[in-house]
A protein has these predicted regions:
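A structural signal for alpha-helical segments
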Residues: 16, 23, 43-53, 81, ...
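Peripheral, non-catalytic segments that deliver or gate enzyme domains
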Residues: 21, 134-158, 166
Length: 197
């Protein structure tokens, strides 16, 4: 369900739930890797190995189930059918960086390009019939998702590109203040005009 991820009205969840997407599993993989590193630091080699193995297994599972021909999918849990969506949420596995196979990284990069506007990443591709400029997860730019996407791109060595997008985002903040989210086309602030992440 969209409430699990916080993207409650995303078009990825437009069908009746439950849905499975790779975003939350990607975050869980990162957490497992951190637990592995922490266990190693504490001298708990077996626990470290266990968490690393769990991370690797989950990564392989999401690649096998939630990606088709390298393309991230929103999959209906009961039927296994993919839901058509132009949501940025399917790009969030980019946080896994180099853990992703080349084909998957390239497919996510293609989707990111379609979500990119002058100011950053729209949460729904602007050419989508379901795009809403002030529609929460159906169009606006959000600071947290921008940071997550840019962090993944940075890990992939896209440093100049990340700096450019960050500069544009900062320019939007300078122009519009720091609201909860921004109109992805105009850069104007939406909703709470003094939001702090």
């Amino acid at each position: 369900h969209g409430n699990d991820s916080g993207w409650d009205n995303s078009t990825a969840f437009i069908e009746e739930p439950p849905m499975a997407l790779p975003d939350l599993s990607a975050f869980l993989i990162l957490q497992m890797e951190e637990l592995s590193a922490l266990a190693e630091e504490l001298g708990k080699a077996e626990e470290s190995k266990l968490w690393k193995e769990r991370a690797d297994i989950l990564c392989q599972k999401i690649l096998n189930i939630l990606f088709r021909d390298g393309e991230p999918q929103a999959v209906h849990t009961f039927t296994g059918e993919a839901v058509e969506t132009k949501s940025l949420i399917l790009c969030l596995p980019i946080v896994l960086g180099k853990r992703l196979p080349d084909e998957v990284r390239e497919k996510i990069m293609q989707r990111l390009r379609l979500c990119q506007t002058e100011w950053g990443y729209a949460t729904e591709q602007p050419d989508s019939q379901l795009y809403i400029s002030d529609g929460y997860w159906r169009g606006p730019i959000w600071a947290p998702t921008t940071m997550m996407v840019l962090d993944g791109l940075w890990q992939l060595g896209e440093h100049e590109f990340v700096r450019e997008v960050a500069k544009r985002f900062a320019g939007m903040v300078q122009k519009s203040g720091f609201p909860e989210n921004f109109d992805s086309v105009t850069g104007a602030g939406n909703r709470d005009r003094a939001f702090s992440w």
